Amino acid sequence: MKRRFSDMVPALLLWAMLSIFLWSLVFNFLTDVPASEKLVLFIDAPLTEETRLAVQLEDVTDEHIQMVQVRSFDYAMMSSHEIENADLYIIGESSIAEYGDWFAPLPEALRTGTLLEGDGQPIGVKVWDAASGKGVAVEVIGYAHPSKVVEDHYLLVGKNSLHVQSHENAVDDEAVNCALVLLK
């Protein structure tokens, strides 16, 4: 019995998708670094040049930080564990309550500008003002993207971050240093 090529297309497509998925897992496994040597920023907005922002932040970190990852929330769908352990977040105001247990109180050094209160203490600092259309890293972050609700965005610190000196088990204060660079 002779098989036609068109009969094999679904199997070939499945093989190609599985191959890409497996190779991406192998690549991530080989190139990833321990959490103590990596700083992660998740942004709940479309990103246009996340690599440029990551390089900009890597330039201000200490030499023991081997990697800065800037990810959109879409990427996090693959690994909810990774997003919950992020060091920094930039999130729209309407989503903050949904992810509220991921955030720590804002360190003193970041308590500048317009602050967002949670449980009686500052948890975020405004990085995008929807009314004025002004904010940080606007050339990289699509705060006012047509697919998003236009709203204020805040920078928040992850409660599981190893890079905030005031946290238990912290190894350094690099998340705060990167946040300060973003806020300039």
Predicted regions span which residues?
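Surface-exposed amphipathic alpha-helical segments
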Residues: E168-K184
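Extracytoplasmic/secreted envelope proteins and their assembly/folding machinery
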Residues: E50-A54, F103, V176-A179
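A structural signal for short loop-to-beta-strand junctions that line the ligand-binding cleft
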Residues: R111-H167
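Early extracytoplasmic/lumenal segment of secretory-pathway proteins
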Residues: K38, F42-I96
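Hydrophobic membrane-insertion alpha-helices, especially the h-region
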Residues: S6-F29
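Extracytoplasmic "Venus flytrap"/periplasmic binding protein-like
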Residues: A76-A131
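Short domain-boundary/entry signatures in modular proteins, especially
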Residues: F29-E37
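N-terminal Lys/Arg-rich, disordered targeting/topogenic segments
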Residues: M1-R4
